[in-house]
From Swiss-Prot:
Stated name of the protein: Large ribosomal subunit protein uL29
HAMAP family: Ribosomal_uL29
Family, similarity comment: Belongs to the universal ribosomal protein uL29 family.
GO biological-process terms attached to the record: translation
Disulfide bonds: none
Species assigned in the record: Lactobacillus acidophilus (strain ATCC 700396 / NCK56 / N2 / NCFM)
GO molecular function: structural constituent of ribosome
Entry superkingdom: Bacteria
GO annotation, cellular component aspect: cytosolic large ribosomal subunit
UniProt keywords, alphabetically: Ribonucleoprotein, Ribosomal protein
């Protein structure tokens, strides 16, 4: 997900996306531990998406203060 797309979301939608990505990351880590994960690049993509969302949320929080 690109930063431009994330910025278009509301704060609640961003928090929901972050929650979804965290759940996906948990599942991917579990698959990796059991040797079932085929696309290991997905781990880094999901982590980066979480970081993007957190960064934009903190930017919005600073704007509002």
């Amino acid at each position: 997900m690109k930063a431009k797309d994330i910025r278009a979301l509301t704060t609640d939608e961003m928090l929901e996306k972050e929650k979804q990505y965290k759940e996906e990351l948990f599942n991917l880590r579990f698959q990796q531990a059991t040797g079932q994960l085929e696309n290991t690049a997905r781990l880094s993509k999901v982590r980066k998406n979480i970081a993007r969302i957190k960064t934009i949320l903190s930017e919005k929080a600073l704007e509002n203060n």
